[in-house]
Amino acid sequence: MASDAQVVKRRKTDLDIFIEPEYLVVFDMSSEVRGSERVKIYRKIRAIRKAAEEQGRYIEWVQKSVLLCMSRDDALALASVFPMSRTKVRIFVVTGEITW
């Protein structure tokens, strides 16, 4: 079990769910990515989150452009939805405590 600071608490209906994040995905979309293209990107992220949740994994938004996830495959899937020429995406492996 991870330390308390490394465990993210997620509120879902009346049930408390705890996850241990393994990967941190940070993205910085260019201002060139606008309107309908942004909407498509966020819809893809929601679809990835839903698919992961159905398999017992969770992806959490921590800040506007920061996501925590439990699997490498989820992190790579998230990174692949962004237009790489106009978005800077970084994936970090969580090895210690995360404090926000």
Positions of the model-derived regions?
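Short linear motifs at secondary-structure transitions and domain/linker junctions
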Residues: 1-5, 40-45, 65-68
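N-terminal, charge-rich interaction modules
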Residues: 1-20
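Short acidic DE-rich linear segments
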Residues: 2-3, 96-100
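Short, intrinsically disordered low-complexity segments
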Residues: 49-91, 98-100
